[in-house]
Amino acid sequence: RVMAEPHIVLRTSRLAKCVGERFASRCIDAVMAGVSFTQIDVLDEARRMGMPWDEAVGFDHSSALSLDMLSRDAMLEGATFMINDEVRERINIADMAFSVDRVVSRLSECMTLRIGDLIYLGAPEQFEVKIGDNYKVAIGDKVLLNFDIK
């Protein structure tokens, strides 16, 4: 069983380590649309055995990322995830548990962010993947990802 999660993806524009929240937005220069895939059965087994989740989330084609990028301000418009042209989720930055600035700041405390790194913002919901489905992810009114599940 495979589940999909839509994401707003941030691209870092500079080297960053221990960046304060008030400066964190300066580290982002673009946003993209993304979808990550998780093998739930593999994840459940890894959890049960106390093992790493790598195989459940890091397999071939485990993530889709738009080629088009928008300015960082576009993330304020939020994202829409559609399956077969039906809106299944709306992601609003203001509704996230942690602000983008907090996420970037915290990540920069744990690791050095480098130019071009991608940050997949958390997704509130997962959707079961079905062969033949069409996925679209839009930021604002621009569809950035449009692909079929094969």
Feature map (PLM): residue ranges:
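Catalytic-core "active-site belt" of small-molecule-metabolizing enzymes
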Residues: 1-114, 118, 125-150
